[in-house]
Amino acid sequence: MTWAPVFLTLASYAAFLLLRHNAPLLHRLALSSMAVLDGMLSDSAEDDKLAALEQATSSLVGALLKFLGLVVAGGTCIATPCMFVDGLGFGLLATWQGIAAVSMGGTLAFMVPKVLPRQERPGKATSDHSPLSQLLHKMVLDHPHVHIALMRREIRAWKARGGTPNPTFLLVTGLARAGTTSMLERLVASGAFHSLNYANMPLVLAPGTWRRVHNPASSPKKERSHGDGIMVGNDSAEALEEVFFQTMASEPYVQDDAVVAHRVDAWCHETYLDYQGIALATAPHPGAMYVAKNNNALLRYPSLRKHNRDFHAVVMFREPLTHAASLRAMHQKYCAMQQDDPFVKTYMDWLAHHEFGLGQKPFKFADQTPLPQSGRNTLNHWLDLWINHYEAALAMDRHRLHFIGYERYCAQPTEVLTGLTQEVGAVVDWEAFEPYTKQRKVEGDVDPAKLEKARTLYNEMQARQRG
């Protein structure tokens, strides 16, 4: 038996290395299982549901058969050394030497080599999300009916504990790069407001359920991928509620060529307030107001306002030429990033974050909204988007709709935040924030007529600011 544990260690290493090498098969098995469950929970038409279930079941059976073959191959590897041990046979696996050998071989297989040849991506950067994290995100966010079922279960439990929806909340919106993230971070940090955060992903529709499973301590903050100096950690607030609207929408509003205006019906609005309730149930400060940064919010604002006269919305805007330049720079940055790490685009698509990058799509507020005709590397393209966005914002119901300019917010952050929280009825003793004075240098030609129109709209919004 002297050499048997050595051979068993090597055989176990080979068996578990085979398992590791076939990790994509295990991922496929997990995703196929979720697809079957998602199909069973679907409320689609019976024929569509059966067709989806048939496809998911076929994929699951195929993955199961391959997995069984993998188990047999691995078991054969481990069993082979046992056949040559006189008097013990498979009893070797029950001895301490056998258990230690299998454990050592299995551990080594997941450590050496560090990267398998098929996992290497020449010229590609390592993703911030591990393969296991990516799998978990796909299991949840690609299967909306499972996600909805978990949300409804959590809402029922919240109501059973006496939870009631509150129609007063705050939306922070505007085109990307207008200062919305900075404002959201400061509002949440005050304790008077609560928002969804990165720690809620991927089970973002059932934050209480996910927190019971995964409740990490605050992580050290690092600069976000935008490269704009804003530091984020797993407890940083972020625009995550779009998963709710994509899941609950009666018709898809992310289309091939644009993200289009859409209507929120009464049932969706009621469910949205319930969803805010379960999000607030996880807030560290009781009595906090729900706040969401959502750059898509204006696309559904008219119907939300018809259902609800109590909520407040902030529209942040910025000098049009510097705003267009900032959007163009971020678009170019994210195109390169997403080519290097495709999961970045997948993640942004889940959040309907189409403002820039390879998945960039313009907002379309009405059928007659003109889509940009200039290339995405021109300032004119982004200026067209700016005009469409803020022209629509200025035409919307003024009730509790607050316009805040980026330049004023940067120059007088404390005064702006004080005025806003007074408007929405929150009591906050704000610290004295340092003004932000950095100016962007703009390079590139622009259509003078477009710029003149944009600056006219900018002046109108400046006039709508309070204070």
What residue ranges belong to the model's regions?
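Membrane-interface amphipathic/juxtamembrane segments adjacent to transmembrane helices
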Residues: R20-D47
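Loop-to-transmembrane boundary segments
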Residues: D47-G74
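Alpha-helical transmembrane segments and their immediate juxtamembrane interface regions
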Residues: I78-E120
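PAPS-dependent sulfotransferases, especially Golgi type II membrane carbohydrate sulfotransferases
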Residues: R121-T164, C335-G467
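A conserved segment at the C-terminal end of the G1
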Residues: T181-H194
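PAPS-dependent sulfation machinery
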Residues: A199-V291, Q360-P362
